[in-house]
Amino acid sequence: MEGVLYKWTNYLSGWQPRWFLLCGGILSYYDSPEDAWKGCKGSIQMAVCEIQVHSVDNTRMDLIIPGEQYFYLKARSVAERQRWLVALGSAKACLTDSRTQKEKEFAENTENLKTKMSELRLYCDLLVQQVDKTKEVTTTGVSNSEEGIDVGTLLKSTCNTFLKTLEECMQIANAAFTSELLYRTPPGSPQLAMLKSSKMKHPIIPIHNSLERQMELNSCENGSLHMEINDGEEILMKNKSSLYLKPEIDCSISSEENTDDNITVQGEIMKEEGEDNLGNHDSSLAQPASDSSSSPPESHWEEGQEIIPTFFSTMNTSFSDIELLEDSGIPTEAFLASCYAVVPVLDKLGPTVFAPVKMDLVGNIKKVNQKYITNKEEFTTLQKIVLHEVEADVAQVRNSATEALLWLKRGLKFLKGFLTEVKNGEKDIQTALNNAYGKTLRQHHGWVVRGVFALALRAAPSYEDFVAALTIKEGDHQKAAFSVGMQRDLSLYLPAMEKQLAILDTLYEVHGLESDEVV
């Protein structure tokens, strides 16, 4: 549905006509239909907002996300408001029903997996008992050979049952958790790093003419270019020739969009052109030096040698780009973005079998980020987050940011260990993974988790397939210059990663935050 509604802006401009479009469960608005190519000035997700009918004005309705977003709207007539209410309510109901069904299926699959995991623990205990029994029979000598045969048969049967149950666990996980629930970037997390033609702090999407603009609009869900940002934010910055997308921008809503309470919004905030803007913005647009192409980076020659880009040289955010702050402070935002940028390595190892590892890594990033966005001004470094929780005596509470960061750095150590093995010339991916796991995560895992990892190792790709997945241009891995490029990029990436992990290790050791808990 689309049409004109009056939107409350501020006490200076009052109610102003805006063109609204309801599409795909998102209500977005523009100055006019003719200005739609510029991108929407604001939008609201119907699935999470409340629809309130005004008690006095029979043409007014309010769309509210408590504590975040407020749309105060008026229709031109009672009948028109009723049509909008029906359309908005239907969109909200459809989205809610769909989401409820997905959540129900997810919960059922989770319960099934928990049941199988309980069975695994039972068989694990039986295995331990039967191994002890086998040892006792062995120490008695060969006189009681029949008993030894019986114990051996029983142990073999238990092992087979254990492996069968473990495979069933993996089948449930593969069937249930390979949907968008697993692979999409979770809300409240930094945008997953994408391969760019060059490292840029602020990605640029050039739009040179009205035809290209229209093509971009046709590909968008709600008629505007947008990208996911922390806390579900979508921030669209406009310019005459380009749209600049900048993640992690904290703004106060402009004066035209303010109510008398001067509400600060962490959701979408759009700066309206041609109107009074008396609000203060915390961040400003970064102007690009020149237009960039969105095509993959090409290899080039320097001093007679071919330079081939790799996954690590084209990462949007890298540990090697992080500049430490005062007292070796690790900037929170840059660190979390760098963590997200390395997550695709797990997809290249196997998006299904390594899904549990990826889910754990992403979950811990999200937990730390949720703490960060509660007070971005204070939690500028990881150390400040940890020390804040230490002082509040919640650092070792379950699901705290400190605990999440503990497991996050352990997961990063595993990835660093694996990449170090590859850099040092290990051609067997299974061996590289097993060595890295043995040095990092294995000591923190119990029998069941170790068994799951052992099963995942069987599906690890060959060295050739893994290296091919790290190329930007197909076939580059067959060139000798690509191996040189991998060595070059990892020689920059791994030491920077190791330095920051060492700083975190020291922080946790000084405050006694390391844990021997086994999962």
UniProtKB/Swiss-Prot annotation:
Residues 1-93 form the PH domain. CDD domains: PH_FAPP1_FAPP2 (cd01247). Cargo transport protein that is required for apical transport from the trans-Golgi network (TGN). Transports AQP2 from the trans-Golgi network (TGN) to sites of AQP2 phosphorylation. Mediates the non-vesicular transport of glucosylceramide (GlcCer) from the trans-Golgi network (TGN) to the plasma membrane and plays a pivotal role in the synthesis of complex glycosphingolipids. Binding of both phosphatidylinositol 4-phosphate (PIP) and ARF1 are essential for the GlcCer transfer ability. GO terms for cellular component: cytosol; membrane; trans-Golgi network. The modification Phosphothreonine is found at T139, T153. One of its GO terms (molecular function) is glycolipid transfer activity. Residues 282-298 have a biased composition (Low complexity). Gene3D superfamilies: Glycolipid transfer protein, Pleckstrin-homology domain (PH domain)/Phosphotyrosine-binding domain (PTB). Homodimer. Interacts with ARF1; the interaction together with phosphatidylinositol 4-phosphate binding is required for FAPP2 GlcCer transfer ability. It is found in: Golgi apparatus, trans-Golgi network membrane; Membrane. The gene is PLEKHA8. InterPro entries: GLTP_sf, Glycolipid_transfer_prot_dom, PH-like_dom_sf, PH_domain. This is Pleckstrin homology domain-containing family A member 8. The modification Phosphoserine is found at S145. It comes from Canis lupus familiaris. Residues 274-302 are annotated as: Disordered. Keywords: Golgi apparatus, Lipid transport, Lipid-binding, Membrane, Phosphoprotein, Protein transport, Transport. GO terms for biological process: ceramide transport; ER to Golgi ceramide transport; intermembrane lipid transfer; lipid transport; protein transport. It is a peripheral membrane protein. Residues 310-519 are annotated as: Glycolipid transfer protein homology domain. The PH domain of FAPPS binds the small GTPase ARF1 and phosphatidylinositol-4-phosphate (PtdIns4P) with high selectivity, and is required for recruitment of FAPPs to the trans-Golgi network (TGN).
